[in-house]
A protein has these predicted regions:
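Short, contiguous hydrophobic alpha-helices characteristic of membrane insertion segments
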Residues: 4-6, 61, 109-110
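Conserved amphipathic alpha-helical interaction elements at protein-protein interfaces in regulatory
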Residues: 22, 36, 40, 55-58, ...
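Intrinsically disordered, low-complexity serine/threonine- and proline-rich regulatory segments
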Residues: 1-8, 91
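Beta-hairpin "wing" of winged helix-turn-helix
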Residues: 57-74, 79
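N-terminal helix-turn-helix DNA-binding core of bacterial DNA-binding proteins
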Residues: 6-48
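Amphipathic alpha-helical dimerization/coiled-coil segments
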Residues: 86-110
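Short, hydrophobic-biased segments on the C-terminal half of alpha helices
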Residues: 50-54
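Accessory beta->alpha helical hairpin/"wing" motif in late/C-terminal subdomains of nucleic-acid enzymes
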Residues: 80-84
Length: 110
């Protein structure tokens, strides 16, 4: 089931940071990983992805560097910073709390 983009929109940065916790990566690879992890139900638009990269880099949450590809075009890699790790931890805690609250509200639990 494909979900509406607005359901995840506020969590785009956390989704990207989660991918970078695993290893440094470049835009296309990050987007393909997100698509694969979601079973094809969620894909970031390229403009959204690169706007998020700029915002995260400007905020000091990620850094970037050019890879040394022997074949093909050079790729810009992104790396999470310690500040980015902290932002991810905060976003994850907020997400977990949101899920708990929404489940309680939707299931009518007190």
């Amino acid at each position: 089931m494909t979900i509406r983009a607005d359901v995840i929109r506020g969590h785009t940065d956390a989704v990207i940071l989660a991918q970078l916790l695993r290893r440094d990566s470049y835009g296309y690879e990050i987007n393909k990983t997100i698509e694969t992890c979601s079973g094809g139900d969620f894909v970031l638009k390229e403009a959204t992805l690169y706007t998020a990269f700029r915002r995260l880099e400007d905020g000091g949450y990620i850094t970037s560097y050019w890879g040394d590809e022997a074949v093909g075009a050079r790729r810009k890699y992104y790396k999470i910073t310690e500040k980015g790790r902290e932002l991810y931890r905060q976003a994850r805690a907020e997400w977990d709390a949101s899920v708990r609250i929404l489940n309680a509200l939707l299931e009518g639990e007190a």
